[in-house]
Amino acid sequence: MEKQILEPQLSALRLPAFNVPWPGARSPHAEVIEARMIEWADHYDLLVNDEHRSRVIRARYGWLAARCYPNAAKELLQVIADYFVWFFLADDLFVDRVETVSGDTLRNLTAMIDVLDFNSAGLEPVWGELAWLDVCRRLRSLLQAEPFERFAQGMRLWATTAGLQILNHIRPKSVGIREYQTIRRHTSGMNPCTALSDAANNGSVKPYEFYQPDVQALVRRANNIVCWANDIQSLGVEIRQPGQFRNMVVIYAEQGGSLQNSVETTAARVDAEISSFLELADAVTARANVTLRGLVDGLKYWIRGYLDWVEHDTLRYVDKFAAVDADDRFLSTPQVASRHSV
């Protein structure tokens, strides 16, 4: 189904509210973290112009970090907030809100992988590369080697599965829901985020605990809840994106039925995933040590923190700015890349 057919249905759309039966929290450092995050983004020239800067200010990514990692030490929380603003902007500018593929796509994405692999930037860094290197070096200094590699592997998979997402948008018709779920699980950026959840609470869990099947299943359910809820909440923006617009709701609509019915189908899946997450979380917690309980708590903070951020803090997905925020093609020019090179 072409997005031109779906866009007129947006104005009458009724979006659900999601509820989880555990309390949220927020770091007391939220305002300071947010302000320093903006200063950091300015330092690395991530904000291309005044309009771009205003978009970031109203998104409040530092508040997302404060809600998802409320117990994190201030230094770690600041790195996470800086990572958030970099990731949202890079994901928009490299993948989501530009042409499906351009002459810079491979250069941009491989540069991000190289920073992880070599702990250095290229001779002619692309936009955001030096900021990304700074985030990685600060995280390396705060985490042990194996926990950092969990984060790094999540980011490598973000950059590589972005290629699968691009392939899906080159096709005249989307892949099915199962294939989409695989792509979404990794392009969302949730895996690197949840990889920091234990360190932000009671410390990093041991590898043999982190990779146990039930723990990994719990991480995947947390990932699914946030991703699929976001597919509903960001729908008004994503449908208007020039290159990447097929999410779970849109794919269900392509298979037949109205956009409203597709929202309700996706919402039912989110609710079912929340129930499954709760059941599995109880089972894992029953035999967990202190650090593993911290990971489970961290996943809960992420789910609730994201939902509270959308409801109370951010303007990233509101209708008022959807049309203008959905298109970054005016930013993705050779002049921008050259401006941020050193």
UniProtKB/Swiss-Prot annotation:
Residues that hold Mg(2+) 2 according to the record: 96
Domain of life: Eukaryota
Gene Ontology molecular function: metal ion binding; terpene synthase activity
EC number(s) on file: 4.2.3.163, 4.2.3.171
Positions of substrate binding: 184
Gene3D superfamilies: Farnesyl Diphosphate Synthase (1.10.600.10)
Co-factor(s): Mg(2+)
Site feature: Plays a critical role for substrate recognition: 92
Protein name from the UniProt record: Sesquiterpene synthase MBR_09977
Species this chain originates from: Metarhizium brunneum (strain ARSEF 3297)
Organism lineage: Eukaryota, Fungi, Dikarya, Ascomycota, Pezizomycotina
